[in-house]
């Protein structure tokens, strides 16, 4: 009887020890990550179907998500540091020049204008980073019935003047009374990003169009600039990405955040968006929204 008891006790111990392996592995992995900040570590366990193995699998999935967030934050820090370095260097150089070398008020004024311009660039960059962070955090937008046609008409009026000042032809063809469910401020921001992009790169003309079908509203912004290669077309929605082409040469191309912001706004509205372009043939940015009947909203 004592032998049988000891055997049962031993079997129970082994069973409990084996059952607790996933817990021990999770604890060990969590401690290693806490000490090393290495989010690439995972729980290495043989396949199993019990609850603890399922928990270990969920733990690994959580680590996958944490690693993506961690890498994204590292990349954002690197990108922001890079983007801020140039304007800050210019500001410091111009400040030193104005203080030590400028011989007259005119030279000092030129330096101050450069400093002011670069300071505004930094402010704009920070504002866009904060806006993108809020969008990526998935904050809830207040969506209501809005008239997309009216939004585009207002923007068209503004950009017609801006295009004219640059010697560009601006045309628009906007279908009337296109009603969608959305946030008016965010939709205006999306279209404004498309239009400011076109204003920057167009050679002679910009087109703003809105067409409707039975269920969809399709807006598009075309320019006749240098265009975008197929490779770049797949990447331009990424943060801080700027196409490496003649499109960017000799131009102050901005922060590289405008299209990333537009992509997040479209996602929050359940809208499709994309670009049609090829190098040397201009670009057409588009977004497609589902139409609604405001009387039923």
Which residue stretches match the model-derived regions?
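Membrane-proximal HAMP signal-relay module
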Residues: 1-80, 84, 89-100, 104-106, ...
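A conserved beta-strand-to-alpha-helix junction within the catalytic ATP-binding
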Residues: 24, 49, 53, 144-160, ...
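Conserved catalytic submotifs in the C-terminal HATPase_c
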Residues: 44-46, 144-145, 164, 169-179
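Conserved micro-motifs of the catalytic ATP-binding
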Residues: 137-142, 179-182
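Short helix-loop "hinge" at the ATP-lid/N-box region of the Bergerat-fold HATPase_c
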Residues: 198-199
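Conserved glycine-rich
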Residues: 204, 270-271
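Short beta-strand/loop element within the Bergerat-fold HATPase_c
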Residues: 205-215
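Acidic ATP/Mg2+-coordinating residue in the GHKL
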Residues: 223
